[in-house]
Structure formats: structure tokens, C-alpha cells
Amino acid sequence: MDSVKTPPPRLIAGDFEHAMLRIPSRSIGMVLTDPPYGIAYKTGMRKDRHHRFCREIEGDRDLSALERAAPEMMRVLMPDSAACVFMAQETLAQAERIMRSAGFEVVNRIVWDKGAHTMGDLTHAFGKRYEVLLYCAKGRPRIRGRRWPDVWRFPRVPQNRLQHQNEKPVELLERAVESLSDPGDMVLDPFMGSGSTGEACARCGRAFMGCEIDPYYYGVAEARLMG
């Protein structure tokens, strides 16, 4: 972990659009985010409708949230910096079009290999074992440290430790942060969920700014990062 002293995380409750309008242009060192995938995701593992994971993710009916966020990502990012966006297989092509329309170059489709496939439709489809992290460039970012291949193998967060139904392992996020930003840089997550990106930034010596519209998950992130 880097020894650079960073300011406390800046957490914003509410819609990312209002928050990002207040961010100065060319002030963010990296965007790393896991936006709504546009697949109306609900976990099939939960039978109790009152369980915290038995809820639709805000804005997950389509990719309109990413469509609104992408131009603002381009505006607030410093020259020669990266936006890394997680996306589902089903909506990957559409997400790439959105990022390109905002002015980004899609450099890599980084495959996150979870090590075990999901259940899903047992008679019609093969088990899904990966998600994609789109590495998108504003200008020409440089890769710091090791040049990793484009398949990253990290196990999923164990079910008994999940704080969000689509939570990403912090170690996976650390690799992205360390590879595409410098110590002390401000990393932005417009859809921070339970705050995993913020934890990765704290471990890596990066400043963090995150937005979350869902009051429940904002509270989870606040307790995780500010507690």
C-alpha cells in the first residue's frame, strides 16, 4: 500500500448528475464505477422479499444512467486518464457505444473471471462465470507497474460478507486503481453502492469521491468508509 496521505473520502448522497455538475473540469485522476447494467437485476438466491438484496437496483431498467454519466466523466477527467466501467455481458455492446459517443476510446475488455459460474437457467444457457471491466481512455493513459493480461481472476465476495448484491472484490478494484492512477489522485465512483471502490482507494493511497442515490447503500458505504 502507498504511504501517501490522502484526504477523507468525499461521499455524496443523491443523484450523480447533480454531484458531478459541481466537480471542476479536468480534476479527476480516474473513474472506476459499477453502474446499473440495464438488465433489471434482482438476485434469484433470495426468497424473502423483505431481505435487503431482494430489491431492484435504482435505474437498472436500461443504460440511461451510464448514457447521462459518460459525458460528465469525460469532462471531469484529467487529460490522459482512464474510466473503467463494469458491465454485464448482455449490455456490453451498448455500453461501448455509449462510451465512444462520449469521446472515449475503448482500449480493453478486461474479463473478470469469478472462478465459479452462476446458476441462472439450468436447461437453456451455460453458466456465466465472468463480467467485463471496460477500460476506456481519455487521451493516452499509461499503465503503471506490471502489464497484466486482460483476464483477471479474483473470487467473488463470499455470500456471508456481501454488503451489496453486485459487490466487486476489493482486490480486483485495487488492481485497476494501482494500474491506472497515481498515488494521491482523486478517483471518482458515480455509482458507489456499498463503497468497495472507496476501500480500494484507501488501501492504495488514492483520494476518493463517491455518489450513491439509494439511501440504504449510502448508509452502508458511509459506515464502511467513514466509520
Model features per residue range: what roles?
Residues 220-224:
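Short functional hotspots where side chains directly engage DNA or cofactors
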